Every structure is written in C-alpha cells, then in structure tokens.
Amino acid sequence: MSPVAGAKFVRTPLQLYRYLLRCCRLLPSEAMQKHYQHAIRQSYNSHVDEDDPQRIQMIIQRAISDADWILNKYTKKK
C-alpha cells in the first residue's frame, strides 16, 4: 500500500507530478525534500512530450513504486 492516499487514482502525468510532490512532504529533512522535488520536476519536464499511452502508464507505475520505496526507506521506524 502506498504511503500517500490516492496512488491508485493517478492516471495522467500531471496527477503523477502532484502525487509525487505530496509524497515529498513526508520525507524527514527539508534538504531531502528539495532534492526529490527537483528530481521530480526534471523528470516531468523530460517526459512531458510523451504521447504513447502504454509508455505513460509504465512511467506512472514505475514512479509510484520508486516513491513507495524511497518513502519506506527514509520513514522507517527504528
């Protein structure tokens, strides 16, 4: 299950972008949040002209699973 509600409703690149930025708010330090926000913006800009629906869905699925992994890594209870 995704740490941020709404992952299953992500259908478009813009929805993915907003979802990933919301995920950044859960990271522990401000520097880490800024780093991942920048990476998300860069990735969005590099894929904004993608028009193949299958490729877009593949990118969305991969980005959500990567975000889940990162959040689980940095927000584990010790």
From Swiss-Prot:
Database matches in CDD domains: Complex1_LYR_LYRM9
Top-rank lineage group of the source organism: Eukaryota
InterPro entries listed in its UniProt record: Complex1_LYR_dom (IPR008011), Complex1_LYR_LYRM9 (IPR045291), Complex_I_LYR (IPR052151)
Family: Belongs to the complex I LYR family. LYRM9 subfamily.
PANTHER family: LYR MOTIF-CONTAINING PROTEIN 9
Protein's name in the database: LYR motif-containing protein 9
Source organism: Danio rerio (Zebrafish)
Encoding gene, per UniProt annotation: lyrm9
